[in-house]
Structure formats: structure tokens, C-alpha cells
């Protein structure tokens, strides 16, 4: 039986990054797909610590909050930098990813039609810090921190991929980010996962936007 179980809706959403991580690291996991009908029935929601998904099982350990799950996997699988300095930078990157993801989700779920144009216009300013971080790490030729992949790389990659869907060409002005997306997406196990039905057939969001 797989050591990990992901309990989530039939979307990529906040589980795309952790699925990318697991696939790229050669880990097996079980998916428990929750339909909206099941969720609205209420008993599962009531059993969840914060009343939301994803829920993640690692043996007898139950975790909620997608970034907590990523950090746990980072520690467990050696994806948290090689020392405390790198770990701090990984945390900083991941917090920056979360800031932009929250803005993205607000657009998608509350203001898509009216707010998309302004969001896309402001997007270069939101992406620039990540280009800067890459430029400061070995000329942007490896990962976002150090010379080993971290959980923040998977989270950032997912964020960039969904923004390429939202605003095609949004990375054209950021050569390091563009190359970073291509480089990480070409990792053999990750490339196979990104092309798999398990990923491709899932919508990005739960409301049909993207």
C-alpha cells in the first residue's frame, strides 16, 4: 500500500505541486477523490481540522494545509536545502509563491471577468522577484535555492505553469524563469507526470476558470 494518501477534489488546485514533488521523487501515493456532492454533504468537512482540503496521510500522521504538507515532504525527502541558510531561503521563496498564489486564487474565484486585465498588467511586477532570485543563484542555471531541488521549486513551477495558461507569454520578459520552467519540466519523472492523464485531465481550478 502506498505510504502517502492525498484526499482532495478532482482538480489540480493546491495539490498540483505536491503531486509533482511525489512523482519527481519516485514516490507512490493513493488518491482519494472527493466529489462536490460528498463535500457538500458536510460530514467530511466537519472532520477536517480547518474545514478544508487537502488532507494528507503519511502513515498515522494526518496533515492539513498544502504548504505544511510540502514542508513535511521537504524534510522527509531531503528537499529543504543543504543547511539552515538554504532552508531559510527556501521558506522565503515558498512564502513568496504563496503570496502570488493567493492573489491568483482571489482573481479566479471572486473577480475573474472584471479583474483579469488588471491582474495580467500587474503580473510582471509579481514575477520579477523570482527572476531576481534565480539571477542571484549560480546565474539562474540550477534551482531557485542552492544546487539541489527543493519543495519550493515544485511550488514555484506549478505557479508559473498556471500563469502561463492564464497569460500566455507572461514569461517572455523573464529569460531565467522561462529557462527554469523548461529545465524543471524536462526532468524525466516530472515530464512523464505532467504528460499523464492523471495530471492533464484534471482542471486547474474548481470553477471552470482555466
From Swiss-Prot:
Q: Which domain of life is it from?
A: Eukaryota
What species does this protein belong to? Pongo abelii (Sumatran orangutan)
Annotated function: Conjugation of reduced glutathione to a wide number of exogenous and endogenous hydrophobic electrophiles. Involved in the formation of glutathione conjugates of both prostaglandin A2 (PGA2) and prostaglandin J2 (PGJ2). Participates in the formation of novel hepoxilin regioisomers. Negatively regulates CDK5 activity via p25/p35 translocation to prevent neurodegeneration.
Q: Which residues carry this modification: Phosphotyrosine?
A: 4
Instruction: Locate the N6-succinyllysine modifications and list their residues.
Output: 103, 116
Q: What is this protein called?
A: Glutathione S-transferase P
**Signal sequence bounds:** none
Q: Which residue ranges does the record assign to the GST C-terminal domain?
A: 83-204
Amino acid at each position: 500500500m502506498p505510504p502517502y494518501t492525498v484526499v482532495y477534489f478532482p482538480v489540480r488546485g493546491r495539490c498540483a505541486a505536491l503531486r509533482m514533488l511525489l512523482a519527481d521523487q519516485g514516490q507512490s501515493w493513493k488518491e482519494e477523490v472527493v466529489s462536490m456532492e460528498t463535500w457538500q454533504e458536510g460530514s467530511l468537512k466537519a472532520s477536517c481540522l480547518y474545514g478544508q482540503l487537502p488532507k494528507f496521510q503519511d502513515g498515522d500522521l494526518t496533515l492539513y494545509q498544502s504548504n505544511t504538507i510540502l514542508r513535511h515532504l521537504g524534510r522527509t525527502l531531503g528537499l529543504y536545502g543543504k543547511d539552515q541558510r538554504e532552508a531559510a531561503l527556501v521558506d522565503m521563496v515558498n512564502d513568496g509563491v504563496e503570496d502570488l498564489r493567493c492573489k491568483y486564487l482571489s482573481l479566479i474565484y471572486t473577480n475573474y471577468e472584471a479583474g483579469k486585465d488588471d491582474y495580467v498588467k500587474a503580473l510582471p511586477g509579481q514575477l520579477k522577484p523570482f527572476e531576481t532570485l534565480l539571477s542571484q543563484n549560480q546565474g539562474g542555471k540550477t534551482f531557485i535555492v542552492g544546487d539541489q531541488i527543493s519543495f519550493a521549486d515544485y511550488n514555484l513551477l506549478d505557479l508559473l505553469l498556471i500563469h502561463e495558461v492564464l497569460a500566455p507569454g507572461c514569461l517572455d520578459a523573464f529569460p531565467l524563469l522561462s529557462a527554469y520552467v523548461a529545465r524543471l519540466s524536462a526532468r524525466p519523472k516530472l515530464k512523464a507526470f505532467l504528460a499523464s492523464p492523471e495530471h492533464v485531465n484534471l482542471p486547474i481550478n474548481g470553477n471552470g476558470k482555466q
